[in-house]
Amino acid sequence: MYLKKISLFNFKNFSDTSFNFEHKINCFVGKNGVGKTNVLDAIYHLSFGKSYFNTLAVQNIKHDEDFFVIDGEFDKQERSENILCSLKKGQKKILKRNGKIYEKFSDHLGFIPLVIISPTDADLIREGSETRRKFIDSVISQLDNQYLQGLILYQKVLSQRNALLKYFAVNRIFETGTLDIYNEQLNDLGQSIFEKRKQFLNDFIPIFNSFYQNISNSAETVQLEYESQLEKQDLLSLLQENINKDRSLQYTSVGVHKDDLSFNIAHYPIKKFGSQGQQKSFLIALKLAQFEFVKKQSGEKPILLFDDIFDKLDETRVEKIVAMVNNDDFGQLFISDTHSQRTENIVKMTHQSYKIFNL
């Protein structure tokens, strides 16, 4: 599978621009602010139906315009596939496959497998547990729609339970009947989510470790571990034991919405003890492991986006990454970089067909 062509209309800084791509390596080079990352984000839209960078979709519309359109032509298993994503101010975003509108964006998830590696991935280290849970969920959801639907339902029931706890506090009442129903629903949904996350990480962590050791040339050891309250106790028991605490807080304090991943180097938090190069290597290994996991599970090579990833990496680590993507295990690769000569030197090392777009 590969992206043959993309057309952008009023998307971020592009008014009306098209790119025709090589099936292996495509590079966007130029100064900061010319739109390199915007092209990668447009490609990301075609896979996920949303931006990787902007939570507000309307911010992706070009200034002084009222809509954007991203139109992509793919070759997938020797069939031509057209994916179109568009948004008009004040209206719902539209996602189409071959002219047919998706009723639910979740039905499209996984059809165009894709992995992005970007400087914003540093949020996985810097930010709170929600960011790391989203990473787990995004990987599993690409491959398991049932998991995604369970996750959506869990969040809905969780919101209802939290609203009930607030209602109890405001009205100074308490009754267990409705709460017990929500507890049972959360338990069933939460246990399923926990089991799938645990199974995913059992498979994922060895792949991650292998990539990190390769990138770092085994210079240091790292640890990636799953942390969940459900490791020691079922969710129903936890909910029942913490009811007084939840009533006081007016929200649900236990459940899979509190799960986390710990990132360590030599058994110390990488956030505090890892250098910039080590942190970047950790995140790249994490995303390459995502690529490998999705490829194995889906049977397709995901499109891989490298957004300005070579800064703060020494030459040895860059060469290791290039060597890894320079084999048949990887498919189409998109690279953005501010240094055109560095980019050309890197892609020449691969001996693959490539195209460089100077923006």
From Swiss-Prot:
Q: Which UniProt key words apply to this protein?
A: ATP-binding, Cytoplasm, DNA damage, DNA repair, DNA replication, DNA-binding, Nucleotide-binding, SOS response
One cellular component term (GO) for this entry is: cytoplasm
List positions binding ATP: G30, K31, N32, G33, V34, G35, K36, T37
| InterPro entries linked | AAA+_ATPase, DNA-binding_RecF, DNA-binding_RecF_CS, P-loop_NTPase, RecF/RecN/SMC_N, RecF_2
Record bears the keyword ATP-binding? yes
What's a Pfam family this protein contains? Answer: SMC_N
| Chief location bin | cytoplasm
Q: Name one GO biological process term.
A: SOS response
Domain of life of the native organism: Bacteria
Localization terms from the record: Cytoplasm
Listed GO MF terms: ATP binding; ATP hydrolysis activity; single-stranded DNA binding
Function as written in the Swiss-Prot or TrEMBL entry: The RecF protein is involved in DNA metabolism; it is required for DNA replication and normal SOS inducibility. RecF binds preferentially to single-stranded, linear DNA. It also seems to bind ATP.
Task: Give the similarity note.
Answer: Belongs to the RecF family.
Matches recorded under NCBIfam families: recf
Task: Output this protein's name.
Answer: DNA replication and repair protein RecF
Question: Which lineage?
Answer: Bacteria, Pseudomonadati, Bacteroidota, Flavobacteriia, Flavobacteriales
> What gene is behind this protein?
recF
